């Protein structure tokens, strides 16, 4: 049926192949920013992280790890919100791709709260309980199920208060919508290919819940957000 979730068929995205001209990559990253701004990506992240910030002691720095940061657009909107709330914050933004980090460096010049670190999401150079919150946006769908479970397990280990996974929801309707939208609003080859592929690479809410359980995450919620977003949030019971 059209309204049922299609089977997951993990395919590579062109951005992951890292062989496109970087001006084309930059243009595609700007498309991602627009998608996050107008299709709820930032809204979902800020909704959840605001709840963590409100419960954080005002006299202590709020320490965040952003996994697979890309252009660092997610840390930027988080820092903007923290500034509005007069909360002292530090965001460590991790990515394995040096080209991405060079691009992110240009974007965060006005954000001394953000610190870029090159490293592998599968083995980040951080110990247990190193951060108040770990966040990961539009990245989990790039990985196999086993890899995704390991990332959730690591996020749970590294965070003191919890973690936020903000990603796409696999569905035929979402695929059709983004396929049409990208043909209407962008000429970028990478965006036109990767956006529909991302939707079909994504997990469903039930799969997210199953993976969290497999990762040993004890206290979590999985919520759907319009349009076709999933928020997987872990909160420590003692937080």
Regions found by a protein language model. Give the residues of each.
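A short, conserved alpha-helix within the catalytic core of class I
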Residues: 143-154
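Class I SAM-dependent methyltransferase Rossmann-like catalytic core
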Residues: 18, 22-53
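A conserved beta-strand element that flanks and buttresses the S-adenosyl-L-methionine
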Residues: 135
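Core SAM-dependent methyltransferase catalytic element
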Residues: 221-239
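Class I SAM-dependent methyltransferase SAM/SAH-binding core
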Residues: 65, 71-123
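C-terminal alpha-helical "lid/dimerization" subdomain adjacent to the S-adenosyl-L-methionine
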Residues: 168-215, 221
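Conserved beta-strand signature within the Rossmann-like core of class I S-adenosyl-L-methionine
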Residues: 159-168
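N-terminal auxiliary segments of SAM/dcSAM-dependent transferases
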Residues: 1-18
